[in-house]
Design a protein with these regions (language model features):
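A structural "domain/chain start" motif
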Residues: 1-42, 135-143
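Extracytoplasmic
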Residues: 5, 30, 34, 42, ...
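Extracytoplasmic/secreted envelope proteins and their assembly/folding machinery
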Residues: 28, 32-36, 95, 121, ...
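Short, solvent-exposed, polar/charged sequence segments at loop or secondary-structure edges
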Residues: 40-80, 91
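A general structural signal for short secondary-structure boundary/capping elements
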Residues: 48-54, 114, 124-130, 139-143
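A short, terminal or domain-edge coil/loop segment
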Residues: 55-61, 95-113, 133-141
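Amphipathic beta-strand/beta-sheet edge segments enriched in Tyr/Trp
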Residues: 76-117, 123-125
């Protein structure tokens, strides 16, 4: 199955006094790199490079245009998502997999994770990655 993964967006509404923008950007890049590596290593999938620039989820083209571009590049599924830091301890990761032809959401899932350090982000990435990769073949077979 050909899959494309757009960079996730990150939002911090925790109102913490310290500006953590740089560290969050670094952790999000590491999260995305690990997710792409996981998809690449999984023989069930062929990773199609994203046509979206790194800041695409926030300032890029509309989702329908991103789906069209992913489809034209050969992807059957486009994975999108974001992470929202809600408080000092709690973050929410959202993911969705969308069929690029029908533009139908194949699955959508919300994950919460605790902590805002490298270890917490790595744990979250492993869990999100496993869930996404396990759900993709299952959801495609139900179409």
């Amino acid at each position: 199955m050909a899959v494309s993964v757009d960079d996730f967006k990150y939002i911090d509404t925790s109102n913490e006094p310290t500006d953590q923008t740089a560290v969050h950007e670094k952790r999000l890049r590491a999260f995305m790199t690990a997710l792409l590596d996981d998809v690449t290593a999984d023989r069930r999938f062929e990773l199609v490079p994203s046509s979206c620039a790194p800041n695409c989820p926030i300032q890029g083209p509309a989702l329908r245009d991103r789906l069209r571009a992913a489809s034209q590049a050969g992807a059957q599924i486009l994975i999108i998502g974001g992470i929202h830091k809600m408080s000092t301890l709690v973050q929410l990761a959202r993911t969705a997999a969308i069929d690029t032809t029908s533009q139908r959401v194949v699955f959508r899932k919300f994950f919460t994770f605790r902590g805002d350090n490298d270890e917490a982000w790595q744990r979250a990435e492993r869990f999100v990655s496993e869930e996404v990769r396990d759900r993709l073949p299952e959801s495609r077979s139900q179409q």
